[in-house]
Curated annotation (Swiss-Prot):
Pfam families: PH. Residues 207-303 form the PH domain. GO terms for cellular component: cytoplasm; nucleus. The keyword Manganese does not apply. The keyword Coiled coil applies. InterPro entries: EF-hand-dom_pair (IPR011992), PH-like_dom_sf (IPR011993), PH_domain (IPR001849). This is Differentially expressed in FDCP 6 homolog. Residues 311-541 form a coiled coil. Keywords: Coiled coil.
Length: 596
C-alpha cells in the first residue's frame, strides 16, 4: 500500500464525517478547515491567501470547478513527503473527526486511545477500496494476533462464535463493536487488551519487529550497558529506558548487514553481534530463547532489506491477499466445476429424456410402420385381386377376340375358296368369251336383226348397273363394319396392353388377316366386275333368234355353229346364277333373263 493510499483512507473518514446528509457533498467552509489542518499535520507549506482563493464562494476556484478529490491529490497529497511528518498526527486528526460522529463506546471497555489504535490497524489491513471495509479473514487474523500477544488461548469454536455475527465484509464500526462485545472480553481484562492493542499497533503500524532490553558493549570503553532496543526493518535503535525518551544510538540495517551468534566469553553468556559495513555491535540477551528471538528478528529485517520490502506486515498482507485470491479462484473453479458437473448432469438427464423420447418415438414409428406395412399389404392384396380380375377379364376378352379372329379367319378361308371358285369361273368365262367372240364374227351379218336384242341388252345393262351399285353399297357396309371392328379392337387392345402384352401378336396376326381379306376382297371385286362384264356379253349373245327368220344354211353348218356352244353357255350360265344367288340378293320385281 502506497503512502497516498494510506493517507487517503484516513482522509476519507474525515470527509464522510463532514457529509452529514450522505449526499457526497460537504460545504466549502468545512473543506477549507479540513484542508488547513491537513496542510498543518503533513508539514506542507501553504499560503493562507491562496487557500482562501481555492475555497471562494464563487465558481472560479479549483474546488468548485474540479471537486475536492482532484484538489486533495494535486495540492495536498502530491506534496506530502514520507519522513517529513508524523503519520500518527494525521491519523489522530481524522480519527477525532470521525469518532465524534460514528464511535459510541460501550461503557469503558476500550479507551479512546485503544479505539484509535484499532481504527489504525483496521485501516492498515483493510481492502484498497471505498467505502473502507475489511474481509472476514483479515478480521480473524487481527483477532488471533491480539489473542496471541495477550497470551490468551481461544479455541476455533470460541473464535467462530465471536465472528458468527459478522458479515463477509466488515466496517470499522462493526469491528469495534466486536472488540467491545462480552463474547470477546469475557476472558480478558481491559488492561491486558490495552497492552495487546498497543503492542500490535507498534508491530503493525510502526513496523516494530522486536523490542526489549539487551546488554550492549560500548564501542570505546568496552563496558556493557543495559539498553532498550527497538528493531525496525531499516534500523535497530536503543534507548535509555522503555519510555523511549532519550535515544542513545541507532544501527542502520541494510542488505549487507549480518548477525552472528558469539560464544560465551568473559563471563558473558547468550552473546550475538550485528555486523554492518563499518562496525560490529556486540550484544547479550538474558537467555538463549531471547537471543534466538533477536537473531531471528534481525535476520528478518535483513531479508526485508534484501527483498526491497519496507514492511513485514505489508508483505504478509500481500501474501494473505494472494492466498485469498487463490482460494477465491479455487472456490470459483470448484463452483464452476460443480456448475459444469451440474450442467453435465442436467445435460445427461436431458439426453436421457431425449433418449426416452426417441425410444418412445421409435416405438410409435415402428407401430405406425407396422400398421403402414399391414395397410400396404392389404392394398397390395386388393390391387393383386383387382389385377387378377382385370387379367381374367383380359383373358376373356382375348379369348373372345381369338374366337372372333378364328371366325374371321374362317370367313377369310371361305372367301378364299369363293375367290378360287370365281377364278375358275373366270377361266370358264374367258373360254366362253373366246367362243362368243368367234360367234360374234359369225353373227356380224345379222346385226340388223339383232337391234331389238341390243335394246334388251341395254335394259339388262341398267339392271346390272343397279346390281353393281348394290354390290358397292354392300362392300362399303362391309368396310364400315370392318372399321368399327378395328376401332373396338384398338380400344380393347389399349385396355389390355398393361395386363397382357401377348395380345399384340394376336393383333398383328389379325392385321395380316385383314390385309389378306382386303386383298381377297379386292380380288373379289375384280372378279365381280369381270363377271358382270362377261354377263353382259353373255346376255348379249344368249338372246334367241326369232323363229320367223329363215336362213339358208345347211343342216350340218347350223348344227356345227350353235349346237355345242349353246349347251356350254347354258351350263355355265346356270353355275353363274347359282353363285350369284349366294352372294347377291336382287331387288323385288327385277330378274335376269336367261336362255333356255
Amino acid at each position: 500500500m502506497s503512502l497516498r493510499t494510506e493517507l487517503l483512507k484516513s482522509v476519507w473518514y474525515a470527509f464522510t464525517s463532514l457529509d452529514t446528509e450522505k449526499s457526497g457533498k460537504v460545504s466549502k467552509s468545512q473543506l477549507k478547515v479540513l484542508s488547513h489542518n491537513l496542510y498543518t499535520v503533513l508539514c506542507i507549506p501553504h499560503d493562507p491567501v491562496a487557500l482562501e482563493d481555492h475555497f471562494r464562494d464563487d465558481d472560479d476556484g479549483p474546488v468548485s470547478s474540479q471537486g475536492y478529490m482532484p484538489y486533495l491529490n494535486q495540492y495536498i497529497l502530491d506534496k506530502a513527503v514520507e519522513g517529513t511528518f508524523v503519520k500518527e498526527s494525521l491519523h489522530e486528526l481524522c480519527w477525532t473527526l470521525t469518532a465524534k460522529k460514528n464511535y459510541r463506546p460501550v461503557q469503558t471497555a476500550l479507551s479512546n486511545r485503544d479505539a484509535f489504535h484499532l481504527w489504525c490497524l483496521f485501516n492498515y489491513l483493510s481492502e484498497d477500496s471505498y467505502p473502507v471495509i475489511m474481509v472476514a479473514d483479515e478480521v480473524q487474523y487481527l483477532l488471533q494476533k491480539l489473542l496471541s500477544i495477550a497470551l490468551m488461548e481461544v479455541t476455533e469454536v470460541e473464535l467462530g462464535d465471536v465472528l458468527s455475527s459478522l458479515s463477509p465484509v466488515v466496517t470499522v464500526w462493526e469491528f469495534l463493536q466486536v472488540m467491545t462485545s462480552p463474547k470477546f472480553l469475557k476472558s480478558m481484562s481491559t488492561e491486558t487488551l490495552s497492552i495487546a492493542i498497543q503492542d500490535l499497533y507498534e508491530e503493525v503500524i510502526q513496523d516494530v519487529l522486536k523490542q526489549g532490553y539487551l546488554l550492549k558493549k560500548a564501542n570505546l570503553r568496552r563496558t556493557w550497558t543495559e539498553r532498550w532496543f527497538i528493531l525496525k526493518p531499516s534500523s535497530l535503535g536503543y534507548y535509555l529506558s522503555e519510555e523511549c525518551k532519550e535515544r542513545k544510538g541507532i544501527i542502520t540495517i541494510d542488505k549487507d548487514c549480518g548477525v552472528e551468534i558469539l560464544p560465551d566469553r568473559d563471563g558473558r553468556r547468550c552473546m550475538f553481534c550485528v555486523k554492518t559495513t563499518s562496525k560490529t555491535h556486540e550484544m547479550c540477551a538474558s537467555d538463549t530463547k531471547h537471543r534466538q528471538e533477536w537473531v531471528t528478528a534481525i535476520q528478518t529485517a535483513i531479508r526485508l532489506q534484501q527483498s526491497g520490502s519496507l514492511s513485514l506486515h505489508r508483505e504478509l498482507q500481500k501474501r494473505r491477499r494472494e492466498q485469498r485470491e487463490l482460494r477465491e479462484q479455487r472456490r470459483a473453479a470448484r463452483e464452476l466445476e460443480m456448475q459444469r458437473l451440474a450442467e453435465l448432469q442436467n445435460e445427461k438427464e436431458r439426453q436421457q429424456q431425449e433418449l426416452e423420447q426417441l425410444r418412445e418415438a421409435q416405438k410409435k414409428s415402428e407401430e405406425i410402420m407396422l400398421q403402414e406395412q399391414h395397410r400396404h399389404r392389404e392394398q397390395q392384396e386388393e390391387m393383386k385381386r383387382q389385377l387378377e380380375c382385370q387379367l381374367r377379364e383380359a383373358e376373356e376378352a382375348r379369348a373372345s377376340m381369338q374366337a372372333e379372329m378364328q371366325l374371321k379367319e374362317t370367313e377369310a378361308v371361305q372367301q378364299k375358296q369363293r375367290i378360287q371358285e370365281l377364278e375358275q369361273l373366270q377361266d370358264h368365262l374367258q373360254e366362253a368369251l373366246a367362243q362368243e367372240i368367234r360367234a360374234r364374227h359369225d353373227e356380224e351379218a345379222f346385226r340388223h336383226a339383232q337391234s331389238k336384242l341390243l335394246m334388251q341388252e341395254e335394259e339388262k345393262l341398267r339392271v346390272l348397273l343397279r346390281m353393281r351399285e348394290e354390290q358397292t353399297q354392300y362392300v362399303e357396309r362391309a368396310q364400315k363394319e370392318k372399321q368399327e371392328l378395328q376401332q373396338e379392337m384398338a380400344v380393347t387392345s389399349k385396355e389390355l396392353q398393361e395386363a397382357q402384352k401377348q395380345l399384340e401378336d394376336v393383333r398383328e396376326n389379325r392385321e395380316r388377316a385383314d390385309r389378306d381379306v382386303q386383298v381377297a376382297q379386292k380380288k373379289l371385286r375384280q372378279a365381280s366386275t369381270n363377271v358382270r362384264h362377261w354377263n353382259i356379253q353373255m346376255n348379249r349373245l344368249m338372246h334367241p333368234i326369232s323363229p320367223g327368220e329363215k336362213r339358208i344354211v345347211s343342216g350340218s353348218g347350223f348344227q356345227g355353229l350353235w349346237g355345242i356352244p349353246f349347251t356350254r353357255r347354258d351350263s355355265s350360265l346356270k353355275r353363274l346364277q347359282t353363285l350369284d344367288g349366294k352372294d347377291h340378293t336382287h331387288p323385288a320385281g327385277e330378274h335376269v333373263e336367261t336362255f333356255h
